[in-house]
């Protein structure tokens, strides 16, 4: 037992779970098993800490995690705990994009959460350091911490350095993975040749780390800092940077200290912490996937967060970070000018951050920021609030007759406040890609892709392949794309996703026909189909049959809830 320094406090058991496998006659067999992996008589009083990693060598996003897990283990040992490492899955969105594999991406978030819960409960671990690098593994780990309500610290793998390419014309430029998707569209439109396409392919991923812009992985790493679930400053250093090893060691130490103080994940994951995270996402112009993931993490933490909270905060918080996919800079540049603490500090100075929330350091956000003293925005990568990129946040929730339960737009990329045009309707993404390849997409159209929602997809695929192809073909500012699916954090152009209710649930999007006029008003948060509701509902509807009748996607389609609730299961 650990006696709190507070004389009025109760004793805190730093082995709240693992005592059942280390103490007493009944634990003879489990102790024998644990001796075989290195534990001994001197270790039975130590808390057992899981080191949960989504390491694999399928994708560069996760390559650093084995190294970081070693640092976390050393930190746990140094603080008086005993680390026990295990792995879970991770799906690469970059590899699974544009084909059947993308159905499994969002599903992997739930599998990760369930698998971490399974191991921690089965092995009676007391706390956990959570390590992740690819898009869905970050929220999956945070959801697990919230569900289990154990002492937990999250550490990000870090992002990749940008690549550099010189094209045949002599132009040299910085590139990220998103440039390759757009280059495919440009090649199909005859705007570049295969030689330049190959040059871009070879340049986009120069080493280890997650995709470098303010795409989903970097957005969720920033969210983890803002929630207080990661050590401040740990989101922005590049994957190969040895500061990450220091953060890994400190994360291992921190989780043991949280146990000693009796602080668990839900002590940190309060409503105020989620409001801080939303403010940071809005200021960064982060990925629309953050809406889904924050709703899901809040659900696991039993925090009453709703989709409407995003507009309440986004309408007050300006967009100040000039980051890709719409801006000029990447996460390495954020690190160069002081990291996410600079953004949190700026928000706190303007009254947009709750400074009294607790963090994994055991101290408040305000105390941590004061100690780090991160400085002010540089004015280029991160603007001041006196000269923001946009006066409101980078994400907007829209509602109207097309999406009564909501839709999500990344307004950081919208040059057009109002867009109105005739619908071109496609059941699923492939049909839209075929129409684009055939040159059948017309300027001024509203492309509607449906039956791609959480249940109808199933899996709510990201539409990066089609949006990048639209931009690459030169139509990026001339058409609007709407879907009950979702978009990659790297998506650019006029795109609105997460339309709810989805088509398979007989939402209005299911009844839209070619030629129906659709109007989107970003300023008024409106999204409407200009057809009388009775007329719309009277239309004959023949939904496509279920895509999967067995396996994980069949199970998922029966359990998953609306995107407006975070696509939770």
From Swiss-Prot:
The keyword NAD does not apply. GO terms for biological process: isoleucine biosynthetic process; L-valine biosynthetic process. It catalyses: (2R)-2,3-dihydroxy-3-methylbutanoate = 3-methyl-2-oxobutanoate + H2O; (2R,3R)-2,3-dihydroxy-3-methylpentanoate = (S)-3-methyl-2-oxopentanoate + H2O. The modification N6-carboxylysine is found at residue 136. Binds 1 [2Fe-2S] cluster per subunit. This cluster acts as a Lewis acid cofactor. The keyword Iron applies. Mg(2+) binds at residues 93, 135-136, 462. Gene3D superfamilies: IlvD/EDD C-terminal domain-like (3.50.30.80). Its EC number is 4.2.1.9. Keywords: 2Fe-2S, Amino-acid biosynthesis, Branched-chain amino acid biosynthesis, Iron, Iron-sulfur, Lyase, Magnesium, Metal-binding. It is an enzyme of class 4 (lyase). Functions in the biosynthesis of branched-chain amino acids. Catalyzes the dehydration of (2R,3R)-2,3-dihydroxy-3-methylpentanoate (2,3-dihydroxy-3-methylvalerate) into 2-oxo-3-methylpentanoate (2-oxo-3-methylvalerate) and of (2R)-2,3-dihydroxy-3-methylbutanoate (2,3-dihydroxyisovalerate) into 2-oxo-3-methylbutanoate (2-oxoisovalerate), the penultimate precursor to L-isoleucine and L-valine, respectively. Homodimer. Belongs to the IlvD/Edd family. This is Dihydroxy-acid dehydratase. The gene is ilvD.
């Amino acid at each position: 037992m650990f006696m709190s320094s507070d004389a009025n406090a109760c004793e805190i058991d730093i082995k709240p779970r693992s005592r059942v496998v280390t103490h007493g006659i009944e634990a003879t067999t489990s102790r024998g098993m644990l001796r075989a992996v290195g534990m001994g008589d001197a270790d039975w009083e130590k808390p057992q800490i899981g080191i949960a990693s989504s390491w694999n060598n399928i994708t560069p996003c996760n390559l650093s995690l084995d190294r970081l897990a070693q640092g976390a283990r050393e930190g746990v040992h140094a603080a008086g705990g005993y680390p026990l490492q295990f792995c879970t899955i991770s799906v690469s969105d970059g590899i699974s994009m544009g084909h059947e594999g993308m159905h499994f991406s969002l599903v992997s978030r739930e599998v990760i959460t369930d698998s971490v819960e399974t191991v921690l409960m089965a092995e009676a671990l007391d706390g956990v350091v959570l390590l992740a690098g690819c898009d869905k593994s970050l929220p999956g780990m945070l959801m697990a911490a919230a569900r289990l309500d154990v002492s937990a610290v999250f550490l990000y793998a870090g992002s990749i350095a940008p690549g550099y390419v010189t094209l045949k014309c002599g132009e040299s430029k910085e590139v990220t993975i998103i440039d390759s998707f757009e280059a495919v569209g440009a090649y199909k439109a005859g705007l570049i040749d295969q030689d330049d396409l190959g040059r871009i392919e070879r340049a986009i991923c120069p080493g280890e780390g997650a995709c470098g812009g303010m795409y989903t992985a970097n957005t969720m790493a920033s969210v983890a800092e803002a929630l207080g679930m990661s050590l401040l400053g740990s989101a922005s250093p590049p994957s190969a940077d040895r500061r990450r090893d220091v953060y890994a060691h400190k994360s291992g130490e921190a989780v043991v200290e949280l146990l000693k103080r009796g602080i668990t994940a839900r002590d940190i994951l309060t409503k105020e912490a989620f409001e801080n995270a939303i403010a940071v996402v809005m200021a960064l112009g982060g990925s629309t996937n953050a809406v889904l993931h924050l709703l899901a993490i809040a659900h696991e933490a039993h925090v009453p967060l709703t989709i409407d909270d995003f507009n309440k905060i986004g309408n007050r918080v300006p967009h100040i970070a000039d980051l890709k996919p719409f801006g000029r800079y990447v996460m390495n540049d954020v690190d160069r000018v002081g990291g996410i603490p600079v953004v949190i500090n700026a928000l706190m100075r303007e009254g947009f951050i709750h400074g009294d929330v607790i963090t994994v350091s055991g101290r408040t956000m305000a105390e941590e920021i004061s100690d780090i003293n991160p400085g002010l925005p540089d004015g280029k990568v991160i603007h001041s609030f006196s000269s923001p990129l946009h006066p409101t946040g980078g994400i907007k929730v829209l509602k109207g007759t097309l999406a009564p339960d909501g839709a999500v737009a990344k307004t950081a990329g919208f040059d057009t406040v109002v867009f109105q045009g005739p619908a071109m309707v496609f059941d699923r993404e492939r049909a839209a890609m075929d129409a684009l390849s055939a040159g059948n997409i017309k300027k001024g159209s509203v492309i509607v892709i449906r039956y791609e929602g959480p249940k109808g997809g199933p899996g709510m695929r990201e539409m990066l392949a089609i949006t990048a192809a639209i931009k690459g073909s030169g139509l990026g500012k001339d058409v609007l794309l709407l879907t009950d699916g979702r978009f990659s954090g790297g998506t650019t152009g006029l795109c609105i996703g997460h339309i709810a209710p989805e088509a398979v649930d007989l939402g209005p999007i299911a009844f839209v026909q070619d030629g129906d006029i659709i109007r989107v008003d970003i300023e008024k948060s409106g999204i409407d189909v200009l057809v009388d509701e009775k007329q719309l509902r009277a239309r004959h509807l023949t939904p496509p049959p279920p895509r999967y009748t067995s396996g994980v996607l069949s199970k998922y389609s029966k359990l998953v809830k609306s995107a407006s609730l975070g696509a939770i299961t």
